[in-house]
Amino acid sequence: MQSIKEKLNPDHLPKHVAIIMDGNGRWAKSRGKERTFGHKHAIQAVRNAVNACNEINIPYLTLYTFSSENWNRPQDEVSTLMSLISETLLLEAEDIFSKGLRMHIIGDIKKLPPLVQEQLMQLVEITKNNDRGNLVLALSYGSQKEILNAVKQISAEVKSGQLNEEDITEEVFEKHLYTKDLPPVDLLVRTSGEVRISNFLLWQIAYAELQFLDILWPDFGKEDFFRCIYDYQNKERRFGKTSEQLDEQI
């Protein structure tokens, strides 16, 4: 019997997968532990997603690591998360490099602790020439603020005469987003059973397929990732067209 991975069509893979990694707290609570216990065990799920992407050659993976709203969580949890991010970057840096992955960071990283900022920039720098895949971490990220910042930048350029109002297009707007160097998202996955977007990549998921999984993030494995890709491949992406129009293009 074929595995899910073997059933995948290598000619119909998403170029960009984004994941809202949700459910760490509930996973820990179900085991009688503190929320931070779930965050620590979630690292293996991150490895699983990265390795799965690497195995089937999906070029872009974006992980919603820490949202701008997460700063409102209890201070001890935020501190633990920052320490965990720092430790994980140190532990995983060599593996990320050896896989040929290029690291990207999106979000308001100036709010992160100086040590974490430094580690992130070092990882971005040492992987900048890697070309076997792209790992994008969304840190201190909020899509509404990203869009608002883009509007402000464009407004300032119009006011200063650098840009004419009639020249503002979707492409121009996208060049002012954190994700200006990334392709649109093809598949958005959220774990934990919650059905919402949570201020994540609102512009970039305009035509993405959305999948909401009941599994909690620490339990997420490579087979779960491959199942998401399999389900994606069995959906018809129309981009506003009819099925008949798509058939005519084949």
Question: What function would you assign to each model-found segment?
Answer:
Residues 1-250:
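Flexible, compositionally biased loop and terminal segments
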